[in-house]
């Protein structure tokens, strides 16, 4: 069954464009092909969900945050960097706080995963925060840059169109499958 999905033309993981879903009814899997053993399917499924929903963790910084900070320092308006405006500074602070809180959640989860610690709420917490803070970050970037954040036009695009792609991706990342609140 083809599904035409909203695309940011560069989603990681799922890819972009048309998706196909295949349904099987009354299928029996031979015991030798079971993943995780008999009656252990739920454990296999939840392990996948744990990894998908943030328990893998990560240590990388948010590259879009670094780019927007550099852009605001380097771009001048009336002879001054736009980062010197109080409004822009307030928005940049909000962006930085959201990015670093999310990074701390991911660092914690990375540490837990690699030390063999047990997870309870940590993965869904990081996933939910990543999704909601991503939209807040995109909104703050839009408020700083205005319409320049929404175009990939060569003459006026910010960061070679990466900001425009980030704006589209932030909406999709809020709920790439299901709803934001279901973790």
Predicted regions and their residues:
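Tryptophan-centric aromatic hotspots in well-structured domains and transmembrane helices
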Residues: 22-23, 42-44, 71, 97, ...
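C-terminal helix-coil-helix/basic helical segment that borders enzyme active sites and/or dimer interfaces
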Residues: 73, 77-86, 100-157
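Glycine-rich phosphate/cofactor-binding loops in nucleotide/flavin-utilizing enzymes
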Residues: 39-58, 145-183
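Hydrophobic packing residues in well-ordered alpha-helices of helical domains and bundles
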Residues: 61, 85, 92, 123-126, ...
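FAD-binding core of flavoproteins
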Residues: 1-77
